[in-house]
């Protein structure tokens, strides 16, 4: 695409409030950045209905055994990989359920890979490599809205029958036109013109957090506001798990710890055990009947 088109993008324009930032005192530089960052949450608020649709698509995919697949280049790709990586320890889901793909592969997480984002075919190839199916939801991330790699990925996703969602910071973008559904969060010019690792990336991180978290809540991975499907993989998370069990059941620390051990470190199972006075096997059956929903499991028990 032509450079003249790139220059017309909102994310590439100069920010009038930061034009003299090179002459500012350090504290004043930080105030300028902080003031600009305050506008990001407001921009995200404007697109919440669009984010809601993305959550619905994502939940639909997960319920069918499909996946949420983030794909992007550079900062956008890294954000997708980051969000995907946080889901297994937080919600005890398979690493295959939420996937992050970055143009150029793993080495691009640390260093720029020349030309990795410049070809639509590369986006298609990387989705083919993960055996994309029509049960999946693909979220293509590109602040500019014009990255060929992401454009190719979304075109292929749509052709395959997967849900194709674009996430960008410019309106009426190429990737939005290629998608089934678009989220265009317009944060305005960056403090450093074109440096979309700043406000644009912050907005995208917020939205990716929302999509994955809301999807997991709807999949029964959260009870009240507690991380009841946390994967107990270290001492800190074990302490958190025990505290969650205590909070929900009102039992003392020692009882909660024993239940966690008897449930093979499954927080939900431990909670059901203590709430119903049943053993781990019976608690697991209740959770199976309720598709992992604690409230429904307890309701089934009370009616039995």
UniProtKB/Swiss-Prot annotation:
Any single biological process term in GO: amino sugar catabolic process
Transmembrane spans: none
Domain SIS residue range list: 58-221
Protein's UniProt keywords contain NAD: no
Gene3D superfamilies noted in UniProt: 1.10.8.1080, Glucose-6-phosphate isomerase like protein, domain 1
CDD domains assigned to the protein according to its UniProt record, in alphabetical order: SIS_Etherase
Pfam family, one: GKRP-like_C
Pathway this chain belongs to: Amino-sugar metabolism; N-acetylmuramate degradation
The organism's place on the tree of life at top rank: Bacteria
Catalytic reaction list: N-acetyl-D-muramate 6-phosphate + H2O = N-acetyl-D-glucosamine 6-phosphate + (R)-lactate
PROSITE patterns reported for this sequence: GCKR, SIS
Role according to the record: Specifically catalyzes the cleavage of the D-lactyl ether substituent of MurNAc 6-phosphate, producing GlcNAc 6-phosphate and D-lactate.
Family: Belongs to the GCKR-like family. MurNAc-6-P etherase subfamily.
PANTHER family: GLUCOKINASE REGULATORY PROTEIN (PTHR10088:SF4)
Entry protein name: N-acetylmuramic acid 6-phosphate etherase 1
Source organism per UniProt: Bacillus licheniformis (strain ATCC 14580 / DSM 13 / JCM 2505 / CCUG 7422 / NBRC 12200 / NCIMB 9375 / NCTC 10341 / NRRL NRS-1264 / Gibson 46)
């Amino acid at each position: 695409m032509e450079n003249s088109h790139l220059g017309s993008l909102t994310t590439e324009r100069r920010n009038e409030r930061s034009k003299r930032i090179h002459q500012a005192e350090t504290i004043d530089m930080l105030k300028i950045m902080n003031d600009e960052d305050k506008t990001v949450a407001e921009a995200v608020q404007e697109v919440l209905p669009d984010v809601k649709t993305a959550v619905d698509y994502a939940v639909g995919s997960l319920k069918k055994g499909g996946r949420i697949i983030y794909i992007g280049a550079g900062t956008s790709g890294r954000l997708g990989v980051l969000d995907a990586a946080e889901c297994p320890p937080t919600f005890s889901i398979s690493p295959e359920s939420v996937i992050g793909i970055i143009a150029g592969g793993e080495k691009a997480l640390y260093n720029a890979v020349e030309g990795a984002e410049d070809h639509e075919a590369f986006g298609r190839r990387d989705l083919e490599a993960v055996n994309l199916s029509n049960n999946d939801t693909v979220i293509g991330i590109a602040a500019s809205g014009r990255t060929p790699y992401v454009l190719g990925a979304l075109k292929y996703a749509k052709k395959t029958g997967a849900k194709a969602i674009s996430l960008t910071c410019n309106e009426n973008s190429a990737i939005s036109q290629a998608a089934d559904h678009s989220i265009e969060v317009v944060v305005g010019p960056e403090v450093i013109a074109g440096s979309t690792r700043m406000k644009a990336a912050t907005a995208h991180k917020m939205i990716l957090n929302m999509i994955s978290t809301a999807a997991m809540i709807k999949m029964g991975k959260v009870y009240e506001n507690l991380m009841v499907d946390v994967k107990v993989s270290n001492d800190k998370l074990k302490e958190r798990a025990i505290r969650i069990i205590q909070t929900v059941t009102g039992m003392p620390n020692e009882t909660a710890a024993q239940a966690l051990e008897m449930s093979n470190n499954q927080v939900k199972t431990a909670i059901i055990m203590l709430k119903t006075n049943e053993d781990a096997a019976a608690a697991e059956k209740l959770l199976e009947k309720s598709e992992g929903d604690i409230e429904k499991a307890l309701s089934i028990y009370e009616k039995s």
